[in-house]
UniProtKB/Swiss-Prot annotation:
Location(s), subcellular: Cytoplasm
Residue ranges: DNA binding: 34-53
Membrane-spanning parts: none
Keywords recorded for this protein, A-Z: Activator, Cytoplasm, DNA-binding, Fatty acid metabolism, Lipid metabolism, Repressor, Transcription, Transcription regulation
Disulphide bond pairs: none
Any single GO CC term annotated in Swiss-Prot or TrEMBL for this entry: cytoplasm
Role noted for this protein: Multifunctional regulator of fatty acid metabolism.
Gene Ontology MF: a single term: fatty-acyl-CoA binding
Protein name as catalogued: Fatty acid metabolism regulator protein
Example GO biological process: fatty acid metabolic process
């Protein structure tokens, strides 16, 4: 097992998570005793204890006082906060993960975009006014697109959508910079922003789903053109 880590705690965390992913520690199994596991990984028991607590908070493990530590089925117990970890564990499956991420965001965004234009159209107009000063660069478009979603999610009246977006942020920021490196993708997005601004100015929330659906289809086709050339290191969080 080859693991790149910045320190003992990071190494221990990646070792355990990789072992769970590779089914060395399958769901429902019991982790080795603390002393044995710390010797196996090569870290102190104090460091291991901190790592186990962190992994339990993320849903990988179940820790109960007086009982051995049990491995969870993370698909049932974890949240969006492990997306970065899954991308790191399975780089070969990263394009599919991105497909699923974009599909989920498209479906959810149709709800909060409509909610924002219905409940706070003036705030939507204010956000969308930024398109008139938007630089024609991948970085500028990726940042604007994220902020657009984030602010309209807040304006929708349901802040839980913001928490969902926060779970996407790291991966989406990196993928977004790659996607918007295409001038065609930027042109497609700009046209979508313009149409959305027209709806916001008219306080027309009824037609938002149709505009979102059209952009979702077209941007999905654009992504399929671009995904096979996506650099492999986008899966890695270098922060």
């Amino acid at each position: 097992m080859i693991i790149n880590a910045k320190g003992p705690a990071s190494f221990a965390e990646k070792y355990i998570v990789r072992s769970i992913w590779d089914n060395k520690f399958p769901p429902g199994s019991i982790l080795p005793a603390e002393r044995e596991l710390s010797e196996l990984i090569g870290v102190t028991r104090t460091t291991l204890r901190e790592v186990l607590q962190r992994l339990a908070r993320d849903g990988w493990l179940k820790i109960q006082h007086g009982k051995p530590t049990q491995v969870n089925n993370f698909w049932e117990t974890s949240g969006l906060n492990i997306l970065e970890t899954i991308a790191d564990l399975n780089p070969e499956g990263f394009p599919v993960l991105v497909d699923q991420l974009l599909s989920a965001r498209t479906n959810v965004s149709a709800i909060y975009f409509r909610g924002a234009l219905r409940n706070n159209p003036d705030q939507a107009v204010d956000v969308l006014a930024g398109i008139h000063q938007l630089e024609n660069t991948a970085e500028a478009f990726a940042e604007f697109d994220y902020q657009l979603h984030h602010r309209l999610a807040f304006s929708s009246g349901n802040p839980l959508y913001v928490l969902i977006l926060n779970g996407f942020k790291g991966l989406y920021s990196r993928v977004g910079r790659y996607y918007f490196s295409s001038s065609d993708a930027r042109a497609l997005a700009l046209n979508f922003y313009v149409e959305l601004e027209k709806l916001a100015l008219a306080k027309n929330y009824i037609d938002v789903p149709a505009v979102m659906r059209s952009y979702g289809i077209n941007s999905g086709k654009m992504w399929q053109r671009l995904r096979d050339d996506m650099p492999a290191d986008i899966a890695q969080d270098k922060s």
